[in-house]
Amino acid sequence: MNRGLYGKLAVNNIKHNRQFYLPYLLTGMLTVAFFYTMLYLNHNPGLDELPFGAMDVELVLGLGAVIIGFFSVIFLFYTNSFIMKRRKKELGIYNILGMEKRHLAKVIFLETFFLAVGAIGGGLVAGIAFSKLMCMLLYAMIGYHAEIVFYVSESGVVSTILLFAGIFMLTFIYNLFQIQLAKPVELLHGSSQGEREPKTKKLMAIVGIVTLAAGYYMAITVDNPVTAVILFFVAVILVIIGTYFIFMAGSIAVLKFLRKRKSYYYKKKHFVAVSGLIYRMKQNAAGLASICILSTMVLVVISSTVSMYAGLDDELAARYQGDIGVSITSENPITEGDALRELVNRTIQQENRSIKEEQGMMTLTFSCISEDGNLVIRKHDDEGSYSSDIIMLRMITREDYEETYNVTVPELSDHEVVLATSDDYDKDTITVGDYTYSILQKQHFSSENGHWMDNQVYYMVVNSVEDMAPLYEAQKEIYGKNASSYYYSLYIDIDGNREEKIACGNAVSAAIGASGMEEGHDGKYYIMIENRAENEDSFRQMYGGFLFLGIFLGILFLMITVLIIFYKQISEGYEDKERFAIMEKVGMSNEEVKKTISAQIRMVFLLPIVTAALHVLAAFPMIRMILAVMNLNNGRLFAYCLLGTITVFTVIYLLVYKMTLRTYYRIVGRQIG
């Protein structure tokens, strides 16, 4: 054959199937543009000039590039397999007319090559053209003000070309195998082959229910933030497996159950809808499950990142209790704490700043093992000590507790305490080591704030620092060099603008360093200094990076979801066209056909979004605890962000439904009346 003929055939085939290839090409270009943009921003030299958080932002953007690359493989393979199924009849005709499979392979290679050049080239042009705009958007989100210089990331271009050229090459190899293994007759009928009625897979349905229930159980019953972080990905995997298995096996079981109910099944609209869904449910189920999982990802990613960014002020307030924070770990807390406080106050006055509010707090925190309601001081590697049994006991003076937590505590005598816990401690006394204390009052606080990493915290309020001494000595004797010391923290709010507060904080740090206190006395104490205004930039940059990534990934997942829905509707339309023509011939009116179509499409479309909403609601407690690790304890804010995300996504989803419904009707030869 003439070599030029292969190229003409490839171009004509793409034009002839433009209703399939145009969405594929456009979304491929967008995916390429997204991937390049992430690499461009990650390698942007301007980010290296960030005073704080440059590593955090670059890490977030690098993670985004990996995620986009991973889903690009899945997305391009899915759409390619759909298009190839629709084109098998066309390729079969070429084969019958005399083209050998090696000739078909050359045509498909050129088609893949042209599509790859269009997607990669167009995507890179779009990515480069809008790179400066994306950089401006990122800088705005992270609160960074700097001149943006236009440049092309050579490493980003090379990495993008290599990745997507590899993906398109893999799709070509997949298509080649499909042609080589198929017979001419199979190619002729490939696009019209429906799914055989699947068998009821009871084991798969049971496994799906069990795994989904297990994932829900983990998400709902998790009781501390670190466990939530550890179990999150396990729960996600279980829910994904459960979703696919239930859609593929459970849905078939339900449809067959409905078919057995003669009073329900033998009605025109139910008969056609149920029998049609059963006939090809295996193919539908995988697509519906994919739509459900992608919808869930959109809801979780966008709601989480938006709430993190919107709650930044709350997170900073929880993390930093003052403009300047100074803490000292010491064996002589009163003497060294007073000296530190005097030095900090003197330095602030020298900087001509006024103290608006000052709060100091002395605590002693050490771990114990809970045994029958008693707290035993014992090393954690001893036999019988488990993480779930560890209690972090935090002792605090009555005066500091009232001032810090704005609560009232009654007068305490010797061996009397106030106990604050997140659980229901029901005893009137508490024994710690060899010491027993009467509980004068019990207080309860939110379990969200009641954990030290993955262990529970008990706050034990005593009259004075001297009342902490017996337990300080007891834990020191047991833990030796790993024993806890007294911890004195000082938080001060000062007047002035941001720059003045940063300068004052730096002056305090310099004064402590010059005094020699920072080095400690024979290593017996350690000082930590925090400057809220200075560290705020780092938080804003990190959370702004997360928001930017969340929006990018949300758009990507939404785009993939829309394309899967679009191709699914086209596939359904072609498969149903002949079937509904037969239904009209056997007596169904045009109106009855339209009602049947609408009922079936509504069921197919609503099932994924409803299931996705259930997934997100079940995951709410776990996600909220994960956000608590990042100091976002405003559950109401997260709930509002989640509700808003669900609302906006549902509106977009319904618009896609309306658009694809029209496409479906055009294919089957009906108009929406």
Task: List each model region and its residues.
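Hydrophobic alpha-helical segments
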Residues: 114-258
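Short cytosolic juxtamembrane segments of multi-pass membrane proteins
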Residues: 3-8, 181-195, 574-575, 665-673
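Juxtamembrane interface at the cytosolic side of transmembrane helices
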Residues: 78, 86, 178, 224, ...
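N-terminal Sec/SRP start-transfer signal
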Residues: 1-32, 197-202, 211, 247-295, ...
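Hydrophobic alpha-helical transmembrane segments of multi-pass inner-membrane transport and secretion
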Residues: 19-46, 55-92, 113-126, 206, ...
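Short helix-loop junctions at transmembrane helix boundaries
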Residues: 40-51, 55, 124-156, 213-231, ...
